[in-house]
Amino acid sequence: MKVNLKLIIGSILISQAQAIWPFDSSGSSSSSDSSPSETGSSGGTFPFDLFGSGSSLTQSSSAQASSTKSTSDSASSTDSSLFSSSNSGSSWYQTFLDGDSGDQKTDYAPFNLTCPSKKTFIRTASELSQQEKDYIHKRQETTNKNLIDFLSKRANLSDFDAKSFINDNAPNHNITIGLSFSGGGYRAMLAGAGQILGLDGRYEDANKHGLGGLLDSSTYVVGLSGGNWLVGSLALNDWLSVGDIVNGKSTIWQLQDSILNPSGMRIDKTIAYYYGLAQAVQAKEDAGFQTSVTDTWGRALSYQFFEEDDSGTGGANITWSSIRNLSSFQDHSMPYPIVVANGRTPGTYIINENSTIFEISPYELGSWDPSLKSFSNIQYLGSSVNNGNPNNTDICVNNFDNAGFIMGTSSSLFNQILLQLDNYSINSIIKMILEKVLTDVSDEEYDIAVYEPNPFFGADSAGIKSITTNDTLYLCDGGEDLQNVPFYPLIQNKRGVDVIFAFDNSADTNSSWPNGTSIQETYKRQFSKQGKGTPFPFAPDYKTFLDKNMGDKPVFFGCNSSDLEDLVAWHENDKINVTDVPLVVYTSNTRMSYNSNFSTFKLSYSDQEKFGAIRNGFETVTRNNLTDDENWSTCVGCAIIRRQQERLGEEQSDECKKCFQEYCWTGGFKDAASVSSVSGISGLAAKTHTSGGTSSTTQQTSTTTGSSANGGSSSTGSSSSSKKKNGGDLVNGGVPSSIFLVFNSLLGLIIAYL
């Protein structure tokens, strides 16, 4: 904790420098701004005054923003010397240095209790856990009813009896829908917020002009990194609707000030904030547990993701497993939430397709991959075990699975900065310093989350013993293997997912738009030892993705299961049928009414930016409020029922065939991302369709240009030309924010050597 505390002290010092930093520390030169009240092609302002909803995003947020801003302004303008007059002459700084905790809480620390009578905490990953089975069984009683309603009213399929189709076939198979939200920092959280809002039947405008009811019909929801900030913060706030955030009923996601400097110029409040973080993490260390920067990062995130209570501890005592106790979970009104993270071996920087992918649910942490093939009870993380059996039945641990820590685990940023440093336009001398600092930080493993004791120590089902012989389990950002859209939990055959709605808000190009890398990498992974047994539809490489403008509108992958016969056969698992491979409905972040291509490392957002990104996300998933395609909801209905129709041998309707002609990518092995090095796969080239056709090629590209609100350089919102030019380059924005993160570490390291 000594170095960790010094890093925090460094953060305090450097956070104050933001006031005089010569660049925009909250913005990205790769993102263009436009007002959220700006009229898009749909006309009207979000949320849809045009349609008579009687509410305006600008209006609904203005009171809240004004209240927040007045507090912030008064805090920053009352005393130009950075100190509140109430603290004048006081020894707040001495209190900090002396370590007087005042009334700060330490609920973050895990604590001991007697072990439960069940003596083993791990199981082999051969089936779903009984708890998940029970939840899904009850959840699908609800989703079936909601899906009947969605297909009948929203999709309005012709000559289709939704009630009999769903109910008559339920004894054999319930249609299972999974939602997958990509990583990408606050950009992904906010764009994803608009996308999930467009599916939410609790939000009236989604029912009138979107896909309202689809969220209510979904069985699973998965998030990674920034996408998990979305999923986690909604789930842990008792399945909060984004509509309540938009309308000011909830005060979470206050992003006006950077997470590094949430109190603006009030250095006394900043000191108290960082001291609270330090004290919480120190309490965990004092309890005998190793900590890392992820602990501090997770605690900081919690202040933004949870409503403040009287204790003022910012969710310090909220655990991931406590989702089980929420009313929306107990009545099965929320989809089953899952987080994705990666295993990261200490000393490594690059995580390839053979990495171990972990998933975290309200009940378990573990991996289906053959390298581990085990799951552990998340409630007892931190307990010392051997093959899941407590080493001391009198002492088990609770509270290790802090919600902020779990969300921080899935979004560690430091290794990402190191991996992408060459893509930043930084002065060579500064770059040399940063490389040295980042190497030192990475060498000390500050960029990962530390799970010690290792919950899988001695696990006998693991294929790679190095995971189970180490006292510590190391996890990191779920997108570091380039699978930034978390498909992994949803392609496990045991879950029986029919269709995945994937929302890609990645920053693959220099302009911070997606280029299909995520879906390409998941497709390729199935041909590795780790991925064998998880068939995934053919997917194009990023060049094809850009050439065909596939980011401009949704694309369906794996439309016809008959095209996947040889692909499934390659997996050599007779328990997997072609209809078990989910159809993927892929939606990319693209400009509709707002340039939401912010840097991943942008750490503060004005209300204009926040609500502009949410609005734009809503429009991407609803095809611009159904104005770009009035039949979009019908086509979504066709995608949902496709696999069940194929199981039953039912012919697709003419209207669904028309939808598939419009949205399906029909490329086969020859058109897909290259996997030429994979043994035994070459025969597929001659056996699959090679048209690669999709009418996405005819979609006009958006080339609206917006200017940055802060007077910085502007960039085009094009989803085609700019992406083609940039190809597969990594994000090149947000340098100031990244530098602040790096300088936090730099100052901490300097202090460490004093």
From Swiss-Prot:
UniProt-annotated glycosylation sites, renumbered to this chain: 112, 156, 174, 317, 325, 354, 391, 423, 470, 510, 515, 560, 577, 597, 625, 631
Gene: PLB3
Superkingdom classification of source: Eukaryota
EC number: 3.1.1.5
Family note: Belongs to the lysophospholipase family.
GO molecular function term, any single one: phospholipase A2 activity
Keyword annotations of the record: Glycoprotein, Hydrolase, Lipid degradation, Lipid metabolism, Secreted, Signal
Region of interest (Disordered), residue spans: 25-88, 687-727
Catalytic activity: a 1-acyl-sn-glycero-3-phosphocholine + H2O = sn-glycerol 3-phosphocholine + a fatty acid + H(+)
InterPro entries membership: Acyl_Trfase/lysoPLipase, LysoPLipase_cat_dom
UniProt-listed Pfam families: PLA2_B (PF01735)
Subcellular location: Secreted
GO biological process, one term: glycerophospholipid catabolic process
Role played: Catalyzes the release of fatty acids from lysophospholipids. Phospholipase B may well contribute to pathogenicity by abetting the fungus in damaging and traversing host cell membranes, processes which likely increase the rapidity of disseminated infection.
Name listed for the protein in its UniProt record: Lysophospholipase 3
Biased composition (Low complexity): 25-40, 50-88, 687-721
Stretch forming the signal peptide: 1-19
PLA2c domain location: 114-670
Species this protein is from: Candida albicans (Yeast)
EC class name: hydrolase
UniProt GO cellular component terms: cytosol; endoplasmic reticulum; extracellular region; plasma membrane
